[in-house]
């Protein structure tokens, strides 16, 4: 379903005026009454035909019936014409299938329209809006926990903020009540299980399996689980009991830092985007599963570049955790010194005041952030007597979070909604 506003805008200028082709390149040219034109590959029109023999469309599933093994990619049209009464393009194919393409359908999907292509790329919920302290301080998006739990528009807006800024906060859950993480997780979708379980607790422990549990001192900036080949993409923490003093949350946008290094320290940027680091994590954690205490032993090992680029050279992942960094460097010994200099410079940039966001989670607050974009830490703290600083948390993957955003855009008929087929 498209938003009513988008449909109305398109309909106002979507009267089909003419159709020509297919030409020798198997292209069909369409013109609308507003002067806009469309260039449609003939085979694409057959493949995307919105008819029951081509697609199964139901509340439970949208899927193409055609199989590529049997699909004739050279098939032709017997005839094509504009049905003026229905304002649609009709094509009768050699196979006997009749396709009907409404004017709005064609305009939204017009492969030769740069605006249509730009709009479609937004379905991936990129690009991010990177930030330093000046851009995010005082502008961090915060939402009511109560409204999040009962209003799907707030769920959408909260998750959309995380997609854009990489972070957002829920305020005011019932204080000291366990189960908030699970309840929020149910509103978002499926929580991602790790070797720390489905939902974990962060507090000081004598037999700590993680640096966050081992000391009340400050921690270094890091992303979680660089020791995994596929680290969780988002992390959430809920404050059950805050510290009497200290324990502030600190975040830095790794994408923003990477772009600073690209401009200011290109030699450092090159090392961090080409040299993989090895991370290890050995130990055990204890889980309660179906009323039984289960010890899970693990020996994790993975390699990541600190800054990963996509095919277009854009930063799309940050992965760094000094506590889990191993001794192994898969490069010539003469290059190791430069690798250390690069890690040092990256870390110093993270700690520059211009890059850091600092705030305090109060009891009942929850923060969700992009674990492969933002680095996080906390400063040292002091507990009140008999009131240990305690958080619960979990992880998510982007597929679940972004699926929820797209689903709600469809369900709520929001302006940003886009067709699935």
Swiss-Prot record:
Query: Which residues hold Fe cation?
Result: 222, 224, 376
Gene Ontology cellular-component terms for this entry are: mitochondrion
Q: Note how many cofactor molecules are bound and how.
A: Binds 1 Fe(2+) ion per subunit.
Which GO terms of the molecular function aspect are on file? gamma-butyrobetaine dioxygenase activity; iron ion binding
Reaction equations catalysed: 4-(trimethylamino)butanoate + 2-oxoglutarate + O2 = carnitine + succinate + CO2
Query: Which biological process annotations from GO are given for this protein?
Result: carnitine biosynthetic process
Q: SUPFAM superfamilies recorded for this chain?
A: Clavaminate synthase-like (SSF51197)
Could you list this entry's UniProt keywords, alphabetically sorted. Carnitine biosynthesis, Dioxygenase, Iron, Metal-binding, Oxidoreductase
Report which residue ranges the record marks as coiled coil: none
Name what cofactor the protein needs: Fe(2+); L-ascorbate
Q: What is its EC number?
A: 1.14.11.1
> Where does this protein act, in terms of pathway?
Amine and polyamine biosynthesis; carnitine biosynthesis
- Belongs to which family? Belongs to the gamma-BBH/TMLD family.
Task performed by this protein? Catalyzes the formation of L-carnitine from gamma-butyrobetaine.
**Name of the protein:** Probable gamma-butyrobetaine dioxygenase
User: Which species expresses this protein natively?
Assistant: Caenorhabditis elegans
In the UniProt record, the gene name given for this protein reads gbh-1
């Amino acid at each position: 379903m498209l938003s009513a506003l988008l449909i109305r805008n398109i309909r106002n200028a979507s009267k089909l005026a003419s159709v020509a082709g297919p030409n020798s390149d198997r292209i069909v040219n369409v013109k609308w009454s507003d002067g806009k034109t469309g260039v449609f590959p003939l085979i694409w029109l057959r493949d995307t035909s919105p008819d029951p023999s081509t697609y199964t469309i139901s509340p439970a599933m949208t899927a193409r019936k055609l199989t590529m093994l049997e699909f004739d990619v050279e098939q032709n049209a017997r005839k094509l014409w504009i049905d003026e009464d229905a304002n649609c393009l009709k094509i009768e194919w050699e196979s006997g299938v009749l396709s009907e393409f409404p004017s709005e359908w064609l305009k939204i999907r017009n492969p030769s329209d740069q605006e249509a292509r730009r709009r479609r790329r937004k379905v991936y919920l990129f690009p991010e809006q990177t930030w330093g302290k000046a851009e995010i301080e005082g502008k961090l998006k915060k939402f009511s926990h109560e409204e999040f739990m009962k209003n799907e528009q707030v769920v959408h807006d909260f998750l959309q903020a995380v997609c854009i800024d990489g972070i957002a906060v829920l305020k005011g859950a019932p204080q000291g009540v366990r189960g908030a993480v699970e309840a929020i997780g149910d509103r978002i979708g499926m929580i991602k299980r790790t070797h720390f379980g489905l939902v974990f607790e962060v507090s000081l422990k004598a037999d700590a399996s993680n640096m966050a549990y081992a000391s009340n001192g400050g921690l270094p900036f890091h992303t979680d689980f660089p020791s995994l080949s596929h680290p969780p993409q988002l992390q959430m923490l809920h404050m059950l009991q805050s510290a009497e003093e200290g324990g502030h949350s600190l975040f830095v946008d790794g994408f923003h830092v990477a772009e600073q290094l690209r401009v200011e320290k290109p030699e450092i940027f090159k090392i961090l985007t080409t040299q993989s680091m090895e991370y290890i994590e050995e130990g055990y954690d204890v889980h309660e599963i179906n009323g039984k205490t289960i010890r899970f032993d693990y020996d994790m090992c993975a390699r990541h570049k600190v800054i990963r680029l996509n095919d277009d050279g854009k930063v799309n992942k940050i992965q760094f955790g000094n506590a889990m960094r191993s001794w192994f460097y898969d490069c010539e010994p003469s290059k190791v010194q430069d690798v250390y200099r690069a890690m040092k410079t990256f870390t110093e940039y993270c700690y520059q005041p211009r890059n850091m966001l600092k705030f305090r989670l109060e009891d009942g607050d929850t923060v969700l952030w992009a674990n492969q974009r933002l680095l996080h830490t906390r400063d040292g703290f002091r507990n009140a007597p008999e009131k240990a600083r305690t958080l619960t948390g979990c992880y998510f993957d982007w597929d679940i979070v972004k699926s929820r955003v797209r689903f709600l855009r469809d369900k709520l008929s929001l302006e940003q909604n886009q067709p699935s087929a």
